[in-house]
Amino acid sequence: APFQSGIIQENEIKSAGSQSELAIAVAGTGNEKILYGLTLGIPFVNYKRTSTFTEADASTALNNFNYAAIEEYLETSGSGVNLKLGIIYRPAPQWRIGFSFHSPTFLKLTDKYSATVTTDTENYKGLLTQSSKEFTNGDLAQYSYLHFTPSRMLASISYVLREIEDVTKQKGFLTGDVEFVNYRASSFKVDPASSDQTETKAYYSKLNDVIDEIYRPAVNVRLGGELKFTTIMTRLGMAYLGNPYQNSNGEKGSRLQLTGGLGYRNQGYFIDLAYVHTTGKDIHSPYRLSQQPFPSAQISQRGARVVLTLGVKF
């Protein structure tokens, strides 16, 4: 029977994860005005996501459909490598002008996935449930692939308060930088160890075409300052992260970040603790249709994270 009262759609998503990086850096100076550095980064990724999408009959009438739901579980883990190159020029003792290039990050990722579909068709078939694990001997389906993130180019300028040779007696600095990221350069490729090379290559070719259509280059702007009290530092900063989407379907990806932190420097050892508060707006679409409109939820983002950095200079 046709639905007279419509369908109620609901999408519940729970996600958690982390991204850490082991950095191996070297730095040097050509003269008193030029400094340079090279960093080898080894990132580690861990992510878990559970999504439940439900469509339910808005009425209580018996029409051979009560609800249908699909619950998906995704676990992603992996590691990779990247390079960062930077140079700082000092036109005057108090000023610093910097340029840096961050290479694409090469990641080898592994997805573990399962899906469970539940339907209640009332008098027709009643309540039925089927899981993808029934086809994988009760295990999560597993698949590995390669992912390349876009490169980044940065330009920065800073002013040092009370510039003297003894850095422990400097009072702080003000800084700003501009970053360019071409998100369209993000791409996925087949893991060379994959057994279904031809079919998978065709899928990733289409996926990369979609990335090229949806994303665009973006500019990120950051401003900040630091005050030094011998070995203790206090910091404040803000960042505006530009929208990476072409807005073909109303996507909004810009974000504003406000940061406060403390730092400790003594005899080559350093500890940095920062709090980052993020706000932004976006949309979420549980599914997309190519030939007709599809539903989207408006999202107001409010997030916070704490970043701890430990290091030693030698």
Residue positions per predicted region:
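Outer-membrane beta-barrel porins/channels
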Residues: 1-314
